[in-house]
């Protein structure tokens, strides 16, 4: 592990996206525009609802974010799948941060509920992931619950987010 801070700014996230944070062939965040947060404000190995880890991140919402111009014309809203992907991105980051080896892949989730939308007038999105379990065998598998809030109101809840880290020769579809 090269870098194990308790928070990461945008430059740190970009370094992760370039593969510079956890070593070659290991967990990477996507680069913009698919990187769905601007900073990780907190990451711990023993915090969160289940005492097994917590990661919290933020996105500063601006009306010119790329998805508002195309989803939908005259009715801009952040696609719900992008908020979900942010939660998966965070689980993968956590697995790399704890020393897991391999490339991250989202593997599914148990349940997802939307009760609001991310609209251009929103100022800040906060993402929270509570780690429930990490299994380390042929692959590293993380299972977590997460939520997304807009300006303090929780509008997405995801249960049993699953992310795996796969060695390059063991990744799904290879």
UniProtKB/Swiss-Prot annotation:
GO molecular function per UniProt: (3R)-hydroxyacyl-[acyl-carrier-protein] dehydratase activity; trans-2-decenoyl-acyl-carrier-protein isomerase activity
Subcellular localization, as worded in the UniProt entry: Cytoplasm
GO biological process: unsaturated fatty acid biosynthetic process
Pathway: Lipid metabolism; fatty acid biosynthesis
Any one GO cellular component localisation term in the record: cytoplasm
Keyword terms of this UniProt record: Cytoplasm, Fatty acid biosynthesis, Fatty acid metabolism, Isomerase, Lipid biosynthesis, Lipid metabolism, Lyase
Catalytic activity entry: a (3R)-hydroxyacyl-[ACP] = a (2E)-enoyl-[ACP] + H2O; (3R)-hydroxydecanoyl-[ACP] = (2E)-decenoyl-[ACP] + H2O; (2E)-decenoyl-[ACP] = (3Z)-decenoyl-[ACP]
UniProt-listed CDD domains: FabA
SUBUNIT field: Homodimer.
HAMAP family registered for this protein in UniProt: FabA
PANTHER family according to UniProt: 3-HYDROXYACYL-[ACYL-CARRIER-PROTEIN] DEHYDRATASE (PTHR30272), 3-HYDROXYDECANOYL-[ACYL-CARRIER-PROTEIN] DEHYDRATASE (PTHR30272:SF8)
Full protein name: 3-hydroxydecanoyl-[acyl-carrier-protein] dehydratase
Native organism: Nitrobacter hamburgensis (strain DSM 10229 / NCIMB 13809 / X14)
Lineage: Bacteria, Pseudomonadati, Pseudomonadota, Alphaproteobacteria, Hyphomicrobiales
Gene transcribed to yield this protein: fabA
């Amino acid at each position: 592990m090269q870098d194990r801070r308790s928070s990461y700014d945008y430059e740190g996230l970009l370094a992760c996206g370039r593969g510079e944070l956890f070593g070659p062939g290991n967990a990477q965040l996507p680069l913009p525009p698919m990187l769905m947060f601007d900073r990780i404000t907190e990451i711990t190995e023993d915090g969160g609802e289940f005492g097994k880890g917590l990661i919290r991140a933020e996105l500063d919402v601006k009306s010119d974010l790329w998805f508002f111009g195309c989803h939908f014309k005259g009715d801009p809203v952040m696609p719900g799948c992008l908020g979900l992907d942010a939660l998966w991105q965070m689980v993968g980051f956590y697995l790399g941060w704890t020393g897991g080896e391999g490339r991250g892949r989202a593997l599914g989730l148990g349940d997802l509920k939307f009760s609001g939308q991310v609209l251009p007038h929103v100022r800040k999105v906060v993402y929270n992931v509570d780690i429930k379990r990490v299994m380390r065998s042929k692959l590293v598998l993380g299972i977590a619950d997460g939520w997304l809030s807009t300006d303090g109101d929780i509008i997405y809840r995801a249960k049993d987010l699953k992310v795996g880290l796969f060695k390059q020769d063991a990744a799904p579809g290879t």
